[in-house]
């Protein structure tokens, strides 16, 4: 079948040998990984060359791989129930993520060939800059602004890289995994100043893992002296 995903994979591997990190087919979905320096050129070829014809960009997002691959919570071992109940530790190993923390992922659509393709590129954690592809697909405008707003990824060449979901005075990037759930500041209307003001957040940050795992005594046999009512 000429327009099968396997055919797309064959064409990509033949055309971009040396320019892509991998081309992986899983669950019927094709993903390619492109080094940052080849990202724009590969995307341009995917759009313009007849063998590919990806005329539409349908999505772009940022990804934070902080703590990716950790197999368990950093907490005490569960007792009767919990995350680690009935798990044999030899079944898996804890895998530490050693690559860059942030990535940009785009999803492309070729209507003429009925293909979908996922393209991923990692950005330097210290610089956080990726080439903008707005010259190739105008639809990426707000997507790149969203990735900048939520993850702090800068897109070189974007003509209007401003926050799009948070307000102008927002501090930080809320989709980063180390961003506090309670935020950094809270705002309220000050009747004396007759305007909205920002103040340091006054609530305690939530903890996502149990602080204490207590022993479960519900199914333990009671001692004989504990039975017999209340006297």
From Swiss-Prot:
Alphabetized Gene3D superfamilies for the sequence: NADH:ubiquinone oxidoreductase, 30kDa subunit (3.30.460.80)
InterPro entries hit by this protein: NADH_DH_suC, NADH_quin_OxRdtase_su_C/D-like, NADH_UbQ_OxRdtase_30kDa_su, NADH_UbQ_OxRdtase_CS
Enzyme Commission code(s) on record: 7.1.1.-
Protein's UniProt name: NADH-quinone oxidoreductase subunit C
Assembly and binders: NDH-1 is composed of 14 different subunits. Subunits NuoB, C, D, E, F, and G constitute the peripheral sector of the complex.
Assigned protein family: Belongs to the complex I 30 kDa subunit family.
Annotated NCBIfam families: NuoC_fam, PRK06074.1-1
Membrane topology value: Peripheral membrane protein
Enzyme kind, highest EC tier: translocase
PROSITE patterns listed in its UniProt record: COMPLEX1_30K (PS00542)
Compartments where located: Cell inner membrane
Catalyzed reaction equations: a quinone + NADH + 5 H(+)(in) = a quinol + NAD(+) + 4 H(+)(out)
Superkingdom classification of source: Bacteria
HAMAP family in alphabetical order: NDH1_NuoC
UniProt keywords, alphabetically: Cell inner membrane, Cell membrane, Membrane, NAD, Quinone, Translocase, Transport, Ubiquinone
Taxon lineage: Bacteria, Pseudomonadati, Pseudomonadota, Gammaproteobacteria, Chromatiales
Molecular function per GO: NADH dehydrogenase (ubiquinone) activity; NADH:ubiquinone reductase (non-electrogenic) activity; quinone binding
Keyword match Membrane: yes
Role noted for this protein: NDH-1 shuttles electrons from NADH, via FMN and iron-sulfur (Fe-S) centers, to quinones in the respiratory chain. The immediate electron acceptor for the enzyme in this species is believed to be ubiquinone. Couples the redox reaction to proton translocation (for every two electrons transferred, four hydrogen ions are translocated across the cytoplasmic membrane), and thus conserves the redox energy in a proton gradient.
An annotated GO cellular component: plasma membrane
Record organism: Nitrosococcus oceani (strain ATCC 19707 / BCRC 17464 / JCM 30415 / NCIMB 11848 / C-107)
